Amino acid sequence: MLPPFLKEVLGNCISEDDRDMMLMGTLTCISATLQNVVGEYNHDDWHPMLYFFVMADAGMGKDSLKYCREIVAPIHNELREASEQLMKQYKESKRESKPGEKDTSYVNEAPHRRTLFIPTNSSAASVIQQLDNNGGVGLIFDTECDTLSAILKSEYGDYSTIIRKSYHHEPIDLSRRKDDEYRVIERPMLAICLSGTPGQLYTLTPQAEDGTFSRITCYHIPFKAEFRDVLVESINHNYDNYTLRGRFFQLGKLYKQRRESFFRGGSYRIVIPQEYCKEFNEHFRQMNQEVVDDISHDMQSVVRRLAFTVFRIMMVLTSIRFMDEISNPSAMTPKDGSRIVIRCSRDDFDIAMAIGDVLIYHTVYCYAHLPQSKVTTNGQGEIITKKSKMEQLLAALPNKFDRETYRAVSMKHGYPVSTTAKWINDYVRQGRLEHSSQNCYRKL
């Protein structure tokens, strides 16, 4: 079902956790390079940039995410080398000009330095400047989130507002007194791919209600008491192609070639067929209700933004499959210069929806362990849902009981009495309790 390119990527993974993490990491990195792709969602056009965070304890393998970087590294390297060449030409031209002579061989301003990657230790001003240099495009990638967490705490480095605004392509601007500088990025297109420990995630998004958290889809790698095979015989291998870094770098060169052909075709619009739209809406409407009922009403923003993320994943999958299948997209470019329309396939729709179903569980888990989260967990760190609390209460009640009895049981378990009263009424409506007489109940 996966596009062939992604099958090749996942063929280099060594565990199920690796496969899930590498799939989302690859989709996120590639999303940062698809600024010529849009799709309509909630009556507006959006680009497919994703935000992704891998949470795991130290030594649990989250560092494998670094190989996803290699898939877009050739694009970054080309941008950087081209910028360095322009800067070299600028400096040489400026040096060769004669004093007092009006020189037209070079521009008065130095060329902008363009890159794909934006360092996590950048100041807020530097992030805006680099996005501006890149035409609004950028990828924040780091396998050690503490670098970003530390810079966000500093007065000059807090660009959390930039992260939140860029998610919805909201304009961001910068004004500095020096040189009377003013920069505005009307439509930032930022992707973020990070990994870190639970403590690093909590530093990045210290509160459950923080708008940053609901924008980031999380994947949690659980602790496993195991040791992988790490030593293998490698005599006579071509190391450039045999090592994981080498194989992913080769995949990066392949992706760069296909993307260049893709860009020669112009710009693209991803369309979700009408028959899938109703299914999408119903799926997330039900998920929203279940999560709000079982976890917390604070999770509604997470579900809504997860739905948006799943739509963006559909856009990325569709674009990758198009690159796999169409070698000369420029032949499809409309004569009027409008966007090439690509319909999302059933496979890519189903894959994205399945990814969303996995991510909601991981994101809920991460949410439940945030400081000040309203979600209850047991001694093993597992989430205690509203349904399990209700079942626990019902099991603790005798076959026949009155209001005073369930009030006492409620207080013993630490549940608000008003909440327990609602649960009792729910069980009556469901036919699991009979309201036999005033203030008296019987299990059925």
Role assignments for model-derived ranges:
Residues 1-444:
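Phosphate-handling catalytic cores of nucleic-acid transaction enzymes
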